[in-house]
Amino acid sequence: MRTRLLVLNLQGLLQENRWREFLPELPQARQRRVLSCRKEEDAARLTGVGLLLRRALMDAGIPAENQIFSENEWGKPYLPGGPEFSLSHAGAFAVCALDAFPVGADVETARITGAVAERFFHPDEVSFLQTLPVFEQADARLRLWTAKEAYTKYLGGGLHVPFSSFCVRLTENGASLELPENVPFLHEYRLGGCRLCLCSRGERPELEFVSIK
C-alpha cells in the first residue's frame, strides 16, 4: 500500500463543540480519553485524530468493528495484523499517517526555546543552530523538533527515545537523519502556522485533506 498522510482541519469540530456528535464513532478507550480532557479544544483534537484513523483504516478495507488496538511496550497503539499508523495534532489540525511499514508523523505549533534545544538536542544540532541568524533559529528549532518526534514515533518508542541520541540535518532542501543506512526519510510540510514532518521508508506523499460531516 502507498503511504497516506491525512489532514483534518478541526475548526468544524470546535464549533459549538460538534466533536461530541462524533464521539460514539470512536472506540471506547479513545472515548474515555476524550472525555477526560479538561479543555474543549483538546477533546476536539483527540476526536479528530480518532476519526481520521477510523476513516483511513476503513479505506484500507478494515471495518470499524475490526479496529481493535493493542499497545507496544512503550504504550504506542497498533492494530495487530493491520497497517502501521501514526497520529498527531496541534493548533487547528489533526494528522494521520498510514503505511505498510513503520511510520511516524508529528505536527507542531509550539515555540521551542533555545534552552529546550540545548537540553534535549544532539550537540551537533545545537552547534548548527548557533550558526544561524537569530531570526531563523526559532523555525529551525521547530523543524528539528518535529523531525525528531517523527523519527521516535517511527521507531515506536516516542519520547522514550532520547532526542540527543541521534542527529537531524537541516538544509534548504529539507531534513535528513544522520544514520549509517539511507532510510528512513524525513518529509517536511507547512500546514497553516504549523510545521509537519513525516518519517517513512517511502517517497513523499501528498497531503490529503479530509472533511468530517
Where are each of the predicted segments found?
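Core catalytic alpha/beta fold that binds nucleotide/phospho-ligands
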Residues: M1-K213
